[in-house]
Amino acid sequence: MHKFFPRSGFFDFETVRILGTACYGGADVAEVLEAVGEIKSDDAASWEEAWRRQSWWAEALADQAREGGDREAARRAYLRASNYARASGYMYVSDLGAEGGNAPPTQDPRALPVAEKVGRLFRKALALMEGEVRALSIPCGAQALPGLLYLPPPGKRIPGRDKIPVLVFLGGADSCQEELYYLYPAAGPGLGYAVLTFDGPGQGIVLRKHGLRVRPDWEVVTSSVLDYLEAYSAQHPGLELDMKAIAVSGASMGGYYALRSAVDRRVKACVSIDPFYDMWDFGTAHVSPLFISAWTSGIISSGFVDKLMTVVSRLWFQMKWEIALTGTLFGLSSPSQILLNMKNYTLSGKSDGSRANGKKSHSPTDGGGVESDSFLSEVRCPVFLSGAGKSLYLDVDSHTRRCYDGLTGVAAKDKELWVPESEGQGSLQAKMGALALCNQKTFQFLDKVLGVQRVPLDVSAHI
């Protein structure tokens, strides 16, 4: 496939991520190509400037269309302005302080203003949507999580069905709910589904404004969301939400969250797009096992690991960005502590970080290669699971297939595995560049397991 940045797989992937939203109004092809022409490979400053300029231009077009009464043009331009603004701040790097320091990272001072601008522009687009969108405030511990409930237009309700099935869409490590729109919220309401999104701990405005850190036990977060949704549905019976047809979904780290959330018996279906099985295994995948063993056994100090990763990150922007992002999510500045904290994010059931000598967690098994203590054995609902054959981050065998094999409590007929091998068919991480196809696969699965019946379309020519 064509490479926008042949020398930077990271910048290339993130460009496809932006361009891929064009099918749902998040980008325009020529605008993206114009921005690409102004960006230097692995140069965060030129990336920020190019997308900031495109956001400004799209916002000006949106205001012109709004003044002229052109609803569709205004909506699409506000979407692009919001998405380009999000992209402009994507390469910001938090300050981790001194090597191996214990103080939480200091986020780039531009990060919060950009996040607020993204939300402001996106809300203008929401006001011009065909279907109703409701703003929610979801209690979760001491913090209220901002959410959005996308409802199908009356004419798009599923024929013959009294109530509306609900898909709860969970964001991932670097997501905000404004970007989540370009997958399920962009397609679900038109198919008769309500779609709920929210910024949870470590995500979007909740992270940037309130500093709420990520947590591994996302089933607790989703449980709070479902509690709220049940109460909200009871308070608003006219919405006709079907509390017996709730599905959860997510991509990448959101796919991990979705699988953890699927243990809640209120969840009747789960869609997990390109999840990791174990974050520690992901984080150490390209490091020598001997080095990891020497470190975790104390032969090599954490201070040495910190110094080594700091030096490498000065030479490799992608690593610098990844360490800063993960440190911001965890509230940690030491690269070694960031890596060790990844052990808590696992589906193996070993969230106590007890793996000895840094060995990969492929055992113990039940004798057939399936981890007998897997958290996934608690899942009972049907699951649609995908992997990405050309992922920049995750190996299919180390993550996707382990997730599939770990679903021992789900009958084979209720598990679907989709692992495309070409980019056009969805082989990039989180199905970037193939969002419409991901929607098609997802809602076909949900229709099947939630009992949604659709009449085949008549495409015979009547012209």
UniProtKB/Swiss-Prot annotation:
The keyword Hydrolase applies. The keyword Hydrolase applies. GO terms for molecular function: hydrolase activity. InterPro entries: AB_hydrolase_1, AB_hydrolase_fold, FrsA_esterase. Keywords: Hydrolase. Signal peptide: none annotated. Residues 350-373 are annotated as: Disordered. It is an enzyme of class 3 (hydrolase). Transmembrane segments: none annotated. The active site is at S252. Pathway: Mycotoxin biosynthesis. Its EC number is 3.7.1.-. Hydrolyase; part of the gene cluster that mediates the biosynthesis of the mycotoxin pyrichalasin H, a tyrosine-derived cytochalasan that inhibits the growth of rice seedlings, but also inhibits lymphocyte capping and actin polymerization and alters cell morphology. Pyrichalasin H is indicated as the responsible agent for the genus-specific pathogenicity of M.grisea toward crabgrass. The first step in the pathway is catalyzed by the O-methyltransferase pyiA which methylates free tyrosine to generate the precursor O-methyltyrosine. Belongs to the AB hydrolase superfamily. FUS2 hydrolase family. Homodimer. PANTHER family: ALPHA_BETA HYDROLASE PSOB, DIENELACTONE HYDROLASE DOMAIN-CONTAINING PROTEIN-RELATED. This is Hydrolase pyiE.
